[in-house]
Amino acid sequence: MAAITASMVAELRAKTDAPMMECKKALTEADGDLAKAEELLRVKLGNKASKAASRVTAEGVVASFVGGNAGALVELNCETDFVAKNDDFLAFSKTVAELVATQNPADVAALSALPLEGSTVDAVRLALIGKIGENVSIRRFVRFETANKIATYLHGARIGVIVEYTGADEQVGKDVAMHIAAMKPVALSSADVPAELIDTERRVAEQKAAESGKPAEIVAKMVDGSVQKYLKEVSLLNQTFVKNDKQTIEQMLKAANSTVQKFALFVVGEGIEKRQDDFAAEVAAQVAAAKQQ
């Protein structure tokens, strides 16, 4: 049995980015043969990636990139908030955002097929899964290309906003993006609010108003009032500016001689059902697995 030295482990780690203990195990199994150990490790990491790729990803980050006349916002997911802070994961997310802005892929599948680091985006993603031991997925992205201005805002990497706007004052774009992150409007104006959201709000308002026992004409006015209030609350232009409660966003923009054309808001994990771990069951499963080894 060949002696496994620290320098051998370090060399294998430098080649594969695998954890130190995994490198040592592979070298031991390969009897000190570095090339064989690397092959064993790549197979092992590949298997690790395939197992991880089926797990729920409800944590992650939002990353942004603006360059020239294009900007992008992307959401990448992982399984834990610990990995969401991992340097390699964060670097990959930034690279993906830049690729979206510069290459204009049609969808996530097209993005995944783009060349990256001598391979493809998806191959790099799978290698990252093998390295960190968690599933990593590119969930969604949005790209703006315009002769107007683009502003982005990230709040703790979990909330991201991209805004297309006009006007000379770049602070306006930053302020609007920050406001969107804080107040989370669903549309630019009342007219842009999706019909299904309005219908839902109207049904809720009708049920509440019906319980009041008031005459039908009064109930109808109550319902209309509730719907109008809702539309103002969820449309960007009608919202009260978070930095000045004496102005709406529309008034602030008018004073700055600016307009907002469109925006997008991403919140990490929005709509994804997080896995609920049963700690006792997890420990029992680990014990059972250990007995089988």
From Swiss-Prot:
Pfam families: EF_TS (PF00889)
Highest taxon above the source species: Bacteria
Region of interest (Involved in Mg(2+) ion dislocation from EF-Tu), ranges: 80-83
CDD domains: UBA_EF-Ts
Originating gene: tsf
GO molecular function terms attached to this record: translation elongation factor activity
Described purpose of this protein according to its UniProt entry: Associates with the EF-Tu.GDP complex and induces the exchange of GDP to GTP. It remains bound to the aminoacyl-tRNA.EF-Tu.GTP complex up to the GTP hydrolysis stage on the ribosome.
Annotated compartments: Cytoplasm
Keyword Cytoplasm: yes
Organism of derivation: Burkholderia ambifaria (strain MC40-6)
Entry protein name: Elongation factor Ts
